[in-house]
């Protein structure tokens, strides 16, 4: 499981390595869990990696593992 944060909003998700980060953000925005701007977010910050990661890659490629927390930047 991973946690994704946007400002004061937070969602915990089951990690699917094959999913693209951008697709996940688009789904969260479509369900109105996150703002519409989240769908166009280009970077997230990983708590474990401590770096900004491009959302145009899969969770596996970005080396995001269960227990990580991502913040939209």
Residue locations for each model-derived region?
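Short, contiguous acidic and Ser/Thr-rich linear segments
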Residues: 6-23, 53
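Short loop-to-beta-strand transition segments
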Residues: 30-52
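Residues in well-ordered beta-strands of folded domains
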Residues: 5, 45, 71
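Short amphipathic, charge-patterned alpha-helical segments
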Residues: 16-38
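Short structural boundary motif marking the start of a folded domain
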Residues: 1-3, 40
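Eukaryotic mixed-charge, acidic/polar low-complexity intrinsically disordered regions
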Residues: 49-71
């Amino acid at each position: 499981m991973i946690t994704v944060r946007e400002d004061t909003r937070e969602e915990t998700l089951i990690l699917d390595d094959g999913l693209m980060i951008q697709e996940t953000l688009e789904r969260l925005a479509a369900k109105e869990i996150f703002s519409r701007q989240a769908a166009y977010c280009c970077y997230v910050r990983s708590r474990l990696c401590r770096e900004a990661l491009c959302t145009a890659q899969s969770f596996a490629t970005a080396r995001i593992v269960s227990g990580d927390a991502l913040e939209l930047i």
